[in-house]
Amino acid sequence: VDRDGEARADRDAAPRADQDGAARAAGQDSAAQTGQDDAAAQMIEGLARLSEGTLPSRMGITVTAASAERVVGTMPVAGNIQPYGLLHGGASCVLAESLGSVGAALQAGPGRFAVGIEISATHHRAVAEGVVTGVATQVHGGRTTATYEIAISDDRGRRVCSARLTCLLREQVPPGGHDPGDVAAARE
């Protein structure tokens, strides 16, 4: 008996047809994953277009990978420093909120939008040059809220900042706003 309580002989005696069916299902899963990857790439493109002229674009924030569960992005230190020549803590917060908000927008889906309602951050070390990378990982993805933990690291992989963001997921696009899930509108 394995750790799930199933008899090994019963499990291993599965007919070949079941294995073929599993292989076909795996192929379908692969195709579905490719479709999800394409949708995420289109979402990143659409968000980049919508972000032109916004604070994240002015700060050089670039999203490199995105799903509702995990978002990765980078930001240059140059241009985002405080008077002592170090990365500004507020810049780390903007990176954290930007990445978490992308994940929350993906969690919300088309026709809905995400707005940050709480952010907290702890700054662990100073950075004077290079690029920082943020990874937002979903802690909670519900119908009305989404929460992310964001780890920001320097070029050497050392933790610079730990942040936590909660977003409210709304049913309608705000007046004058854009639906981040509407990639076609972003291309216009």
Task: Enumerate the predicted regions with their spans.
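Terminal targeting signals and extreme-terminal segments of soluble enzymes
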Residues: V1-E188
